[in-house]
């Protein structure tokens, strides 16, 4: 009896332990699935954010215009990712979403690569870093082959191509910037030599500001910006120098014209004097320059007399003078007495 009880107790114990173990495994599995779902949800949020940014960047680069078919295919891939998420297949949703983001970024890079290569060719910058230019070209040629089969590798290759082309551009503009700075320095020195008038100081300060920004860009290794800044500063200095020179030339011409006019007047006066010279004792004749002293201020400011005497014409004055002389003569004759005894 005791043996049977012992066997029964042990069986019951094993049964309880078995149920407990199964419950623990199921609970652990559920907890693991919950953790995985939480991780997938967090990853999905990051992928969706990256996907939105990648699509915006590709659109701003006009990849949808230059690659309309590829862009439409990526949008379809993006749609499949959303459908998988709705079906709670987060793993698939994340995989499709990540691939779509890769392709958007690759198309955006292809647009940047085309622009950088055109800039290199237009400005003949390849000679400043030939090795990087060669590597950039090689990487660019591999992008399309990887685009369909391996979106991650295609994106990585496009990044490499863009990096090499940027190195070429930096090397080229660094050298060009140094030359442009020298040109700007020479232009600034030429402006300083002509002495800027106070009225033109604002233009000079503006040119100095452009030069200062170019220096800041150069110190930050932004050589393309520094090259453009130094070039603009040199142009501003040269323009201001030309304005000053033009104004001075205009003033010199005016002075020369006045001098020529004065010389012509003197010549005409000399010719007139030769044809009809004034006698040296003539009224107003003088070989010395006439100095006219200004009237006193109180005289200049004195009010005019409204009842001032009218000027008598010269002819009338002469007639009056003659009559006065004749009248005086008659008076003298009438008062003269005969001398007694006559002339001895």
Swiss-Prot record:
To T.pallidum TmpA. Keywords: Cell membrane, Lipoprotein, Membrane, Palmitate, Signal. Residues 260-277 have a biased composition (Basic and acidic residues). A lipid is attached at residue 22 (N-palmitoyl cysteine). The gene is tmpA. A lipid is attached at residue 22 (S-diacylglycerol cysteine). Residues 1-21 form the signal peptide. It is a lipid-anchor. The keyword RNA-binding does not apply. Residues 312-322, 335-344 have a biased composition (Acidic residues). One of its GO terms (cellular component) is plasma membrane. Residues 257-344 are annotated as: Disordered. It is found in: Cell membrane. It comes from the Bacteria. Its main location: membrane. This is Treponemal membrane protein A.
């Amino acid at each position: 009896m005791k043996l049977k009880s012992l066997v029964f107790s042990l069986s019951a114990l094993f049964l309880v332990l078995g149920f407990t173990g199964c419950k623990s495994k199921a609970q652990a599995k559920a907890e693991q699935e919950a953790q995985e779902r939480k991780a997938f949800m967090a990853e999905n949020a990051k992928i969706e954010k990256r996907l939105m940014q990648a699509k915006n960047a590709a659109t701003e680069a006009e990849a949808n215009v230059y690659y309309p078919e590829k862009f439409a295919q990526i949008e379809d891939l993006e749609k499949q990712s959303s459908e998988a998420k709705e079906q709670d297949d987060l793993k698939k949703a994340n995989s499709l979403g990540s691939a779509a983001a890769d392709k958007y970024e690759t198309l955006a890079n292809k647009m940047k690569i085309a622009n950088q290569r055109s800039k290199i060719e237009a400005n003949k910058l390849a000679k400043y870093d030939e090795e990087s230019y060669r590597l950039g070209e090689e990487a660019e040629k591999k992008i399309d082959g990887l685009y369909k089969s391996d979106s991650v590798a295609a994106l990585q290759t496009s990044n490499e191509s863009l990096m090499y082309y940027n190195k070429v551009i930096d090397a080229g503009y660094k050298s060009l910037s140094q030359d442009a700075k020298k040109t700007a320095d020479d232009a600034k020195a030429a402006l300083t030599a002509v002495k800027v008038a106070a009225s033109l100081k604002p233009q000079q300060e503006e040119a100095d500001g452009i030069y200062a920004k170019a220096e800041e860009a150069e110190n930050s290794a932004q050589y393309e910006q520094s090259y453009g800044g130094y070039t603009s500063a040199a142009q501003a200095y040269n323009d201001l120098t030309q304005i000053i020179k033009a104004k001075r030339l205009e003033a010199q011409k005016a002075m020369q014209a006045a001098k020529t006019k004065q010389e012509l007047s003197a010549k005409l006066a000399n010719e007139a004097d030769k044809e009809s010279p004034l006698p040296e004792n003539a009224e107003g004749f003088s070989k010395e320059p006439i100095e006219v002293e200004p009237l006193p201020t109180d005289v200049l400011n004195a009010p005019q007399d409204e009842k001032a005497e009218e000027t008598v014409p010269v002819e009338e004055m002469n007639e009056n003078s003659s009559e006065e002389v004749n009248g005086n003569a008659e008076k003298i004759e009438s008062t003269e007495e005969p001398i007694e005894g006559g002339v001895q």
